[in-house]
């Protein structure tokens, strides 16, 4: 634990000519430093927008400072307010600094930071002291809200690992990239044209409002649910949802491919360690997690290395089983592929795994029993079999009710180690809030376990993290390394998190 704090103030050289300006404020002194001096600093480094300068520091020194607290990351990850995360891309540090420095000084600083004004060291001193004070306030708030331990033990070390990994870059196969770029426009246009003709819609990707306007007159209820929920979980009489989700996947992959220049032999994604209220990790610019599987072959290992891909099996279901302590759910998870067992119970056909998974997660996150049975019937299931199957989870139902009650009473819900979601309103929970409470606990726990796994993975010699997914990772290693060791790390971390209540499952899978 560091006993002192110093503020890093930087002016980024966006031309990448090596002319970044780095300053440290501490002990009432402003000092110009080099990247090498910065990484050798023993004090805790306080800054904002660390993602902008961290890759430059790593590129110059092949390491990062020992302890860095990005105060905007701390504020957003510990507030529990969903809109803080959602508005993050639209705001800068100026709003948060207003309570700690004169507004004119803040405005002047933002102009300096954005290279619209020359460096004024008096302004930097003022802002440095303001950031120190803001850091102390945020740390105190995080401790009071039981978020500090997670930030220091999980979020901060994971961020350092991911930033270092991303700064090392990922090699690109230019020939494959060229082929995919040439094909994607045609593929997207043909998929869009087919979708437009099939559903009599304009030749453009429909917005969420467009989707609501189409589906509501057909009887689909959007009260208390969002568009993604309806598309992913509510069965339809036609293939509208399936086709639209496929079109969206093509569009996302198209955006990723278009964001990578053909001249680029290596890409360096931007890391967002707290990319959602449940603390999911996202890579941006480019958003590699959005690459379609058949486009992933543009990513290649470095010379003499190979890729492996490990993912958790029935991750959410296992977490729900452990959290709820439902004996039926625990047994299903322990006995093999839970979703195949659900398919066998509902459809009497384990080959209907995909539909069974969709129905189970719809149930788990709060779909009403009547709608659930109708949905299963729409897939061809027997109503009585469906009703009887889901009646077995009595303890799980009681657990969900207890989660709802806790959210309503405490006005927030979180994991075993922070990451709370705060309520926006008051009074009885809405159906959407009930789903959000369960989702926050389950998905937040999933993120926590995943990040614990990454911390352990970093200790494995010879393994280089390349792309983290929600419940999987792409990593690079030598030919003589056994990648099953990584699967063991992931499975063991899940087992240990729940103190042996369940045995975690992770395995090697195809990345492409």
Predicted regions and their residues:
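Conserved "right-hand" nucleotidyltransferase catalytic core of DNA-directed polymerases
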Residues: 1-18, 126-289, 306, 449, ...
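Conserved DEDDh/DEDDy metal-dependent 3′-5′ exonuclease domain
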Residues: 5-6, 18-142
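Short glycine-rich phosphate-binding loop at a beta-alpha junction
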Residues: 43-53, 311, 467, 472-477
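Short active-site loop/helix that positions an aromatic residue
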Residues: 51-62, 72-84, 214-216, 313-328, ...
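Function-dense linear segments that define catalytic or interfacial modules
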Residues: 75, 91-97, 273-350
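Long, amphipathic alpha-helical stalk/connector segments used for oligomerization, subunit docking
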Residues: 113-119, 137-145, 149, 167, ...
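Polymerase palm active-site segment centered on the conserved acidic dipeptide of motif C
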Residues: 185-204, 393-396, 480-512
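Conserved catalytic core of nucleic-acid polymerases
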Residues: 344-465, 506-510
